[in-house]
C-alpha cells in the first residue's frame, strides 16, 4: 500500500483542464483512471442504462489525454516515483486481467 497521486490534463494548451487526485493505494489510482473514462462515457450516453467498454477503448482515451501520470510513494526512500502513460496502461491491463481471473 503506497500513497499515489494521479495527475491529469485533458486538453493540450488548456491548463484549466488539469486535475489531480490522491489515493491510498496504487490499485485505487489505476481504478480511478478507469472511473474517469466511465464518467466521460456516462456524460456522452446519459440515457444508457449501463456502460460497457473494452480495454482498447480505454487505452485510446488514455492516449488522447494531453497528459496522464502518477506519483507513487516509496516509503523506503521517502520519495515519490513518477510513472508515465505507458506504465499506467501496462498496470491497468494487469489489474483488469487479475480482476477478470478472480
From Swiss-Prot:
The record's listing under PROSITE patterns reads:
ER
Which Gene3D superfamilies does the entry mention? Enhancer of rudimentary (3.30.2260.10)
- Residue ranges annotated as transmembrane are none
Function according to Swiss-Prot or TrEMBL: May have a role in the cell cycle.
Listed PANTHER family:
ENHANCER OF RUDIMENTARY ERH, ENHANCER OF RUDIMENTARY HOMOLOG
Which gene is this protein's source? ERH
The record's subunit annotation is: Homodimer.
Q: Does the keyword Kinase apply?
A: no
Which keywords appear in this protein's UniProt record, sorted alphabetically?
Answer: Cell cycle
Q: What InterPro entries does UniProt report for this protein, alphabetically?
A: EHR_sf, ERH
Q: Which family does it belong to?
A: Belongs to the E(R) family.
Pfam families of this UniProt entry?
A: ER
Protein name, per record: Enhancer of rudimentary homolog
Superkingdom in the source lineage? Eukaryota
Amino acid at each position: 500500500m503506497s500513497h499515489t497521486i494521479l495527475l491529469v490534463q485533458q486538453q493540450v494548451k488548456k491548463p484549466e483542464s488539469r486535475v489531480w487526485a490522491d489515493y491510498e493505494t496504487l490499485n485505487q489510482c489505476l481504478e480511478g483512471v478507469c472511473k474517469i473514462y466511465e464518467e466521460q462515457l456516462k456524460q456522452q450516453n446519459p440515457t444508457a442504462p449501463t456502460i460497457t467498454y473494452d480495454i482498447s477503448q480505454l487505452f485510446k482515451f488514455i492516449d488522447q489525454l494531453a497528459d496522464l501520470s502518477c506519483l507513487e510513494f516509496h516509503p523506503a526512500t521517502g520519495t515519490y516515483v513518477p510513472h508515465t502513460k505507458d506504465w499506467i496502461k501496462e498496470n491497468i491491463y494487469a489489474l483488469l486481467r487479475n480482476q477478470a481471473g478472480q
